[in-house]
Amino acid sequence: MKPSVILYKTLPDDLLQRLEEHFSVTQVKNLRPETVSQHAEAFAQAEGLLGSSEKVDAALLEKMPKLRATSTVSVGYDNFDVEALNARRVLLMHTPTVLTETVADTVMALVLSTARRVVEVAERVKAGEWTKSIGPDWFGSDVHHKTLGIVGMGRIGMALAQRAHFGFGMPILYNARRQHPQAEERFNARYCDLDTLLQEADFVCLILPLSEETHHLFGQAQFAKMKSSAIFINAGRGPVVDEQALIAALQAGEIHAAGLDVFEHEPLAKDSPLLTLPNVVALPHIGSATHETRYNMAACAVDNLIDALNGNVEKNCVNPQVK
């Protein structure tokens, strides 16, 4: 008899077929309490869980006494109560490698679009404001050979450094938990403390996961240390930044602009001051959102769940110690 799993995300037909070859699959729209109640028996019998973006906490785990593994279609897992998973010896699988290059592309797009004011200027053209040769009020800033500061030199940070160093001749500063010899050798990157990075970088790119340690790592004090000409990019997790402090820094001219793919609360509220600022490029958390990469992430998540329920946790497992 096949193990039972709950699927709370739509999959391409071929991936759903692959999942069904290995498991008895119950598809649900979400993991809200009313949904769990409607499918109580399926949740009670499920040994696996696959999806993304929904909260998986102790209350849900109480309804799933047979759960052995959960697989998220994402690299981030801050929506999972890892402590509760560990207590129940439930494996947590994620997709850390397949989205690296695509997210780095998005970060570089934010660097370019903020510096060159691409979104703002394009909207002015659409509004009919281009009636003569443009003047300085349409100009942006150079990207090439400017100093890029990367906070978080993981896979995505490395991919960003590659683009910036080889493509744009940008000197690289970085701050991370530990020095990264490969980054220093390949990109001539310079390790420095956060204050030094903030003071020297023309672009500050934040690529950090959310944790107790990183929550509101960036606030008023950090923005005050940046150059007034500096551009801030966040493509990690929204709550790593005190959003009100960011808004205040932008409004006061303490920093020049911001490119944001993540926010403290998502979706971003329609009345957010960020949406009124012309020097802000706001994206709807599209870091990995290409057809190709989202397919590859889903395929990886399916394979991860198959591996986990077969006792294979050699890759992509957050908590292999609970096996």
UniProtKB/Swiss-Prot annotation:
The active site is at R237, E266, H285. Its EC number is 1.1.1.79, 1.1.1.81. InterPro entries: D-isomer_2-hydroxyacid_DH, D-isomer_2_OHA_DH_cat_dom, D-isomer_DH_CS, D-isomer_DH_NAD-bd, Glyo/OHPyrv_Rdtase_B, NAD(P)-bd_dom_sf. It is found in: Cytoplasm. Disulfide bonds: none annotated. Keywords: Cytoplasm, NAD, NADP, Oxidoreductase. Gene3D superfamilies: NAD(P)-binding Rossmann-like Domain. The keyword Oxidoreductase applies. Pfam families: 2-Hacid_dh (PF00389), 2-Hacid_dh_C (PF02826). GO terms for molecular function: glyoxylate reductase (NADPH) activity; hydroxypyruvate reductase (NADH) activity; hydroxypyruvate reductase (NADPH) activity; NAD binding. It comes from the Bacteria. It is an enzyme of class 1 (oxidoreductase). Catalyzes the NADPH-dependent reduction of glyoxylate and hydroxypyruvate into glycolate and glycerate, respectively. NCBIfam families: PRK15409.1. Homodimer. Belongs to the D-isomer specific 2-hydroxyacid dehydrogenase family. GhrB subfamily. This is Glyoxylate/hydroxypyruvate reductase B. It comes from Klebsiella pneumoniae (strain 342).
